[in-house]
Design a protein with these regions (language model features):
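Short, glycine-/Ser/Thr-/acidic-enriched flexible segments
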Residues: 75, 82-84, 144, 178, ...
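N-terminal small/glycine-rich loop or linker at the start of catalytic domains
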Residues: 130-144, 240-253
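Bacterial Sec-dependent N-terminal signal peptides
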Residues: 1-21
Length: 528
């Protein structure tokens, strides 16, 4: 009997091994690669001495992932499932338990590779998120209120926006407005009249979004009732609802492969819209790490890890005002994406441009570079309002101003002196002035599928710009070269041609220039 069991185990093991597919990319001289995960942005491009690795089934580095790699020499790789990748030296090694690899040459450039893979696997949808995301700043109550979301302070924050001369736009009320996780009703002690609050915010010129997640507190009545209906992930090998550990504790998780569970959750959100006039939702979580096939069972028997991430994003797309952080296989969908929480630090600032480029090259072009100054609330703890690095906040704001979207959270009027506040106000207005152009680029992306924020090598191949990660093109028109350190000077690589900068000076391209950048200035260059 033992021998039979051993034989069966060995046979099963052989099946598992045979099901795993592998691919090895030998990086050519001068070739660079992008892809796999937005969170690896600062490690891109691969092949220039940088190392990177990820296991897409297990984790996502707090952001979007996609089963693609694309190269500066026109090569593109697609996998029909999540893969494990290690990029080091002149090789990229990949394995997948759930998919097969397709490595193909689409042309000679990064743009050729992206467009080839994109048209084949996530073509343009023709749809774009609401224009307000692109034409006005977005605001989020997270850093100011953290877990103390309440009606009085939400209104105070909104009033601060208006009183300090910032444009109104989308306003997101973040985590802990609700009675409990999965109990999507305002906490009465914190929000005595939520309908009146939403009406007032609308009258002030805001659209209102609420934070939501796929978790449900196990010890709530809602959790117990929904568990009986079978709406949650099951503990592996049992009929009991699974309990997962996430950043706010222990919870059940909706199994969105169950059509009834999905319909129920969608109705919960739609009901908030009907009763309170809510415009949309910030869809947090959905990360594949909460849906491991090793730990849970799912309704349809197949939608594990990234498949549930995709189902969460698809639920988000049912609401026009949405925001995602985790995503899978929804390139070119009309989903607002956000870079994962960045620290209040200069490293956090340096991560913004590479992250935005990485997101765009996966098809996630309608993206916001996190929150101005950072969205990781713990890095704001213990700092007196007059002790913030004002230059860091301003430089972060400047980067946001020439991105598809910009998002404030920490209130600049609370932590900045008059001079630095004036600068932030000016760049919020500048973003609005660029609104028509940014919106036109968003609409063009909806038709062509090409990213709004582009790597220099994407727009200017063959000019040795593959390694440039601190400047970018916003559409075809603007080369943006923000300051991402505490210095007031930087080098700018100008592609061939003529360029007019933000001061009106015309430069001859095809060279590197060094420019002075006082705190008031965001360097940008218009192609002539």
């Amino acid at each position: 009997m033992k021998r039979e069991i051993l034989t069966l185990a060995l046979a099963f093991g052989a099946l598992v091994v045979s099901a795993q597919t592998t691919e090895k990319i030998n990086i050519e001289d001068g070739e660079r690669w992008w892809g796999a995960a937005t969170g690896l942005g600062l490690s891109m491009p691969y092949g220039g001495g940088k190392k990177a690795e990820i296991d897409q089934r297990k984790y996502n580095l707090n952001n979007q992932t996609s089963p693609l790699l694309i190269s500066s020499k026109g090569r593109g790789l697609w996998c029909s499932g999540p893969f494990k990748m290690k990029a080091e030296g002149k090789q990229i090694n990949l394995t997948s338990d759930k998919g097969s690899f397709e490595l193909q040459t689409y042309g000679k450039t990064l743009r050729d590779a992206y467009c080839g893979v994109m048209q084949k696997h996530f073509p343009p949808t023709g749809s774009v998120p609401p224009e307000l995301f692109f034409t006005r700043p977005t605001y989020n109550t997270w850093i100011e209120l953290v877990y103390n979301q309440n009606q009085a302070d939400v209104m105070k924050y909104a009033k601060g926006i208006v009183d300090n001369g910032f444009p109104t736009g989308v306003l997101m009320i973040d985590d802990n407005w609700q009675q409990d996780y999965g109990v999507w009703e305002f906490r009465a002690e914190q929000f005595p009249n939520p309908k009146a609050m939403v009406d007032s915010l609308h009258d002030m010129g805001f659209k209102v979004m609420l934070w939501v997640c796929p978790f449900v507190s196990p010890d709530s009545k809602k959790g117990r009732d929904l568990a009986k209906k079978g709406y949650f992930l099951k503990r592996k090998g049992t009929d009991e609802p699974a309990v997962v550990v996430w950043w706010n504790g222990y919870s059940h998780v909706y199994d969105l492969s169950n059509p009834e569970a999905r319909a129920y959750l969608k109705h919960e959100f739609a009901d908030l819209q009907q009763r309170y006039g809510i415009d949309g939702f910030k869809f947090d979580a959905g990360d594949q790490c909460y849906y491991s096939e090793d730990e849970v069972d799912v309704y349809d028997g197949k939608s594990y890890d990234v498949a549930q991430t995709q189902l969460w994003a698809q639920l988000g797309s049912e609401f026009s005002y949405n925001e995602m952080r985790a995503c899978w296989l929804e390139g070119n969908a009309p989903l607002v994406q956000r870079l994962g929480d960045k620290d209040y630090s200069w490293l956090g600032v340096r991560q913004l441009v590479p992250g935005m480029i990485a997101a765009g090259l996966q098809g996630y072009g309608y993206t916001c570079p996190d929150m101005i100054g950072g969205g990781s609330f713990t890095t704001f703890y213990g700092i007196d309002p007059d002790k913030f690095d004002q230059k860091l906040i301003v430089r972060s704001c400047q980067i946001h101003s020439m991105m598809p979207m910009m998002q404030f959270s920490v209130a600049p009027w609370r932590i900045l002196d008059k001079h630095h506040l004036d600068i932030c106000r000016r760049y919020a207005a500048w973003h609005s002035q660029l609104g028509d152009y940014i919106l036109s680029e968003a609409r063009r992306m909806a038709k062509t599928g090409e990213p709004m924020v582009r790597a220099m090598d994407y727009s200017f191949p063959g000019q040795g710009l593959e390694g440039i990660v601190d400047q970018y093109m916003l559409g075809d028109k603007y080369l943006v070269a923000p300051v991402v350190t505490s210095a007031d000077q930087r080098d700018v690589r100008l592609p061939k041609g003529k360029w007019r900068d933000d001061t009106g000076k015309v430069w001859r391209g095809g060279r590197t220039i060094t420019i002075n950048v006082p705190i008031e200035r965001l360097p940008w260059f218009e192609r002539l």
